[in-house]
């Protein structure tokens, strides 16, 4: 309730309640394919694709028995990041028992406030996410703090690999921004 200057109450004028922490402003499960995301294939023949069996998006640079050079982006539609938000998603890496030492350089999450369809002309900022200790195909929860960069921001999952480097498959599902 609000008070008038003479101390009287004004009924019915309740202040706006803040958003509940559990309310997602954006979500995409990938259960039915790529959804509202798009892809950008910068290098290599491989690309992000929907996995109908595991209900996720996945990317691998493994082809014809070897790891090949790739750079591929999985990009969200515009998301309101006019204030800091929390990103959550599930991720899995394969094959089994591979090192995750270089994960933070190869399997990364980025945000941009000026992406307009070409990843090479946008300014991207990497956000820190958590990774499992080793690969093993099991989905685990990942989380990141997304900075306040504007009402028309884009989120991207970037997969990178060099020729001959040991590569992992990266699977992503149940993306949410809260």
Question: What do the PLM-derived regions correspond to, one by one?
Answer:
Residues 33-36, 113-118, 162-164:
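Acidic glycine-/aspartate-rich tracts in secreted/extracellular proteins
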């Amino acid at each position: 309730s609000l008070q008038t200057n003479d101390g009287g109450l004004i009924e019915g004028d309740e202040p706006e309640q803040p958003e509940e922490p559990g309310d997602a402003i954006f979500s995409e499960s990938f259960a039915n394919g790529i959804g509202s995301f798009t892809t950008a294939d910068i290098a290599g023949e491989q690309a992000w694709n929907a996995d109908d069996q595991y209900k996720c998006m996945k990317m691998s640079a493994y082809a014809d028995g070897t790891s090949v050079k790739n750079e591929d982006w999985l990009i969200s539609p515009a998301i309101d990041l006019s204030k800091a938000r929390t990103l959550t998603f599930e991720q899995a890496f394969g094959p089994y028992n591979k090192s995750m030492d270089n994960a933070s350089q190869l399997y990364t999450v980025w945000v941009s406030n000026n992406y307009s369809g070409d990843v090479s002309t946008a300014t991207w900022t990497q956000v820190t996410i958590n990774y499992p200790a080793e690969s093993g195909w099991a989905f685990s929860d990942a989380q990141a703090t997304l900075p306040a960069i504007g009402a028309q921001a884009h989120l991207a999952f970037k997969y990178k690999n060099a020729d001959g480097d040991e590569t992992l498959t990266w699977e992503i599902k149940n993306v949410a921004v809260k």
